[in-house]
Amino acid sequence: MKRLALIGSTGSIGKQVLQVIREIPDAFVIETLAAYGRNRESLISQIREFSPRVVAVRDETTYKELRKLFPHIEILSGEEGLIAVATAASVDMTIVASSGIDALPAVMASIQERKTIALANKESLVAAGELVTTLAKKNHVQILPIDSEHNALFQCLEGRDPSTIKKLILTASGGPLRNKSKEELQKVTLQEVLKHPIWDMGPKITVDSSTLVNKGLEIIEAFWLFGLQAVEIEAVIHPQSLIHGMVEFCDGTILSVMNPPSMLFPIQHVLTFPDRYPSIISGLNFLTNQTLEFLPIDDERFPSIRLAKDVLREGGSMGCFFNGANEALVQRFLSGEIAWYQIVSKLQTLMDKYVVRSCLSLEDILQVDSEARALASEC
């Protein structure tokens, strides 16, 4: 039985993690929970259902309320609480289901304590890929990707000779705006952006999907996650979202992972790895899914992939700057300060002006992130 820490339990991924655990109850126990969002009622329900030993929250009001409701459970708050949840001695696997760089200290602390990492937090690798992967190698810690694309690549690469790998291919649905012209993209509304054709996600990642910055972040994540520096990483539009990732080998063979577009598939794979359990939902029926389309990404309309590859070429602190600036710009769009098309145009302008430096510590990363957000909030 695996003993789990779950960071981000009330978010979209966190709730689906718990859905898998409900269906395979004999395989897992929730030791600790952390929820830093505002979904207080959902967290209370989760505590009652799963009886974790330790719970961490962000705000003081929720902290005080939970202490009254659950006097027998250790309730913590702040960054220290998050780290305590992630590194509890009884935990085997830390599941990082939250988005944003706030989870990075807990990720680093978990690796230091040699916990297996189930990672749905792409920002940790985009902002601090070298630090995270170096520490993981040093401590012999395995990072298992929950993102559907990286999970697909992980399955295709398992047991393969790195010297035989030619290319990694990430697929993208194209987001809610994929069929709009460049002129139409100048006028899109928040309502249009948040109406994703395939995935039900939070607002930030849905905006990232619409700009294809999300796919750019995933290219950077794949670079660090798989450590295949000499291998080309590409992204293609695949509107059906049935193939989630592909690996091309030197002999021309391409392996892929196919399943219906549900995060329950990669979540179950990671939680049960290296074993395989019967799927908790129906798989792919080839007789009813007969069309597979693949389209190139139009750089004129969606330059985010090019920007992500610029990040990899620049190295150093650019990944952290790219991530922090994008997060701030997305928040400005969500609050109505800037138009949708300005997210990437301002991001490119900021990147062009930024002077890359080395990032040797967690403190360096957090400093660059803070600077990026400040600049993106003012431009």
UniProtKB/Swiss-Prot annotation:
The identity of this protein, by name, is: 1-deoxy-D-xylulose 5-phosphate reductoisomerase
**HAMAP family under this entry?**
DXP_reductoisom
Binding locations of 1-deoxy-D-xylulose 5-phosphate: K122, S148, E149, S173, H196, S209, N214, K215, E218
* Enzyme class (EC, first level): oxidoreductase
| Annotated EC | 1.1.1.267
Point out the gene that encodes the protein.
Answer: dxr
An example of a Gene Ontology BP annotation on this entry? isopentenyl diphosphate biosynthetic process, methylerythritol 4-phosphate pathway involved in terpenoid biosynthetic process
**Which cofactors does this protein require?**
Mg(2+); Mn(2+)
The family database entries (InterPro entries) matched by this protein are listed as: DXP_reductoisomerase, DXP_reductoisomerase_C, DXP_reductoisomerase_N, DXPR_C, DXPR_C_sf, NAD(P)-bd_dom_sf
Q: Name any one Pfam family assigned in the record.
A: DXP_reductoisom
Alphabetical list of NCBIfam families matching this protein = Dxr
Question: What keywords would UniProt list here?
Answer: Isoprene biosynthesis, Manganese, Metal-binding, NADP, Oxidoreductase
Function in brief: Catalyzes the NADPH-dependent rearrangement and reduction of 1-deoxy-D-xylulose-5-phosphate (DXP) to 2-C-methyl-D-erythritol 4-phosphate (MEP).
Species assigned in the record: Chlamydia muridarum (strain MoPn / Nigg)
Highest classification ranks of the organism: Bacteria, Pseudomonadati, Chlamydiota, Chlamydiia, Chlamydiales
Binding-site list for NADPH: T10, G11, S12, I13, R38, N39, N121, E123, G202
What is the similarity comment for this entry? Belongs to the DXR family.
Q: Which reaction does it catalyse?
A: 2-C-methyl-D-erythritol 4-phosphate + NADP(+) = 1-deoxy-D-xylulose 5-phosphate + NADPH + H(+)
Coiled-coil region list: none
